């Protein structure tokens, strides 16, 4: 798939099962960016990671990785390594009680 074809709408079609609890028509690429980034990274595998890199800037990705509490620890660690984010700056996941 060429870069020009990798649009937000194409991502929603390809990754629709990941957004089972959300109305895709209500998702906004920028306003809901951190939510979309975390969902793609947590459940989208390598395809989700590639979509994140294609759709979002480095700063948007770093912000989501630092601030989203729902990222899996392995995803958070991988992204911290990829984007050289100091682990001390990452928000810790809150365990279920």
Regions from the PLM with identified roles:
Residues 1-97:
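Long, compositionally biased intrinsically disordered regulatory segments in eukaryotic proteins
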């Amino acid at each position: 798939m060429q870069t020009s074809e990798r649009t937000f709408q194409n991502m929603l079609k390809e990754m629709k099962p990941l957004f089972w609890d959300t109305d895709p028509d209500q998702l906004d690429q920028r306003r809901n960016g951190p939510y979309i980034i975390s969902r793609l990274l947590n459940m989208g595998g390598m395809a989700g990671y590639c979509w994140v890199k294609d759709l979002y800037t480095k700063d948007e990705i770093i912000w989501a990785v630092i601030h989203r509490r729902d990222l899996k620890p392995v995803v958070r660690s991988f992204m911290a390594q990829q984007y050289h984010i100091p682990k001390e700056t990452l928000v810790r996941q809150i365990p279920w009680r």
